[in-house]
Amino acid sequence: MNLQELYNWIFHQNPDFSGLSLKATGIVLGLVLALSHLFAWLNAEASIAIARRFPRNRTWGIVILGICLVWSLFLAAYMDMGEFFTFRRYLLMILPVTFALVIMYVPEFLAVRALGTLMLLAASPVLHAAFLQPQISRLLLPILAYVWIIVGMFFVGMPYLMRDWVTWATKTAGRWKLASLAGAAYGIVLLVVALVNY
């Protein structure tokens, strides 16, 4: 499978509309949500420390923004741009320059902005996987995707909000554990539904 075929598979651009399945997407996201939130619940002290350091962690910011750059280059290189296809090469040049400029001149809360960008990018494959699927339970995926979109926009434009949210959530261990259990529960429900109903 070449990169164009991979793009077509992820975003259901094949002539028969085949691609990334609802079941596979649900299983992967369910596992990620369940395991990550269970880790946060079982290791509250360590995970709270990680969460508090994250907003101003420059290393994480560069790593996540690098992932966003590669993802954006992939999209720009293989997406159907219609009548704007002549701008493709300029876009491919602008993206790395923007990456460098953001790292150099927007260091404040870089990790939060990068995470917000990643959330915006990640929402699209999830929405494509659930599009036109008959199961009502498919809505578990679009709900998650739209939460990512809304929160991602706030993280990019108002990154200090993540610091405030983390401060609130980590004020007590009980509050952190409750939030972790809620995330784990959503992941487990999504995983079970994906295995049984998708």
What label would you give each PLM region?
Residues 22-26, 46-67, 115, 141-145, ...:
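Juxtamembrane helix-loop boundaries in multi-pass membrane proteins
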Residues 29-32, 36-39, 67, 95-99, ...:
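Membrane-embedded alpha-helical transmembrane segments of multi-pass integral membrane proteins
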Residues 46-55, 71-84, 99-110, 164-168:
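Short juxtamembrane and helix-loop transition motifs at transmembrane-helix boundaries
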Residues 66-78, 98-105, 122-133, 184-191:
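Hydrophobic alpha-helical transmembrane segments and adjacent interfacial helices
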Residues 133-198:
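Terminal transmembrane helical module of multi-pass membrane proteins
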Residues 83-151:
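Membrane-proximal helix-loop-helix units in multi-pass membrane proteins
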Residues 12-20, 75-85, 128-139, 195-198:
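Helix-coil boundary and interhelical linker segments in multi-pass alpha-helical membrane proteins
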Residues 1-70:
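N-terminal topogenic module of multi-pass integral membrane proteins
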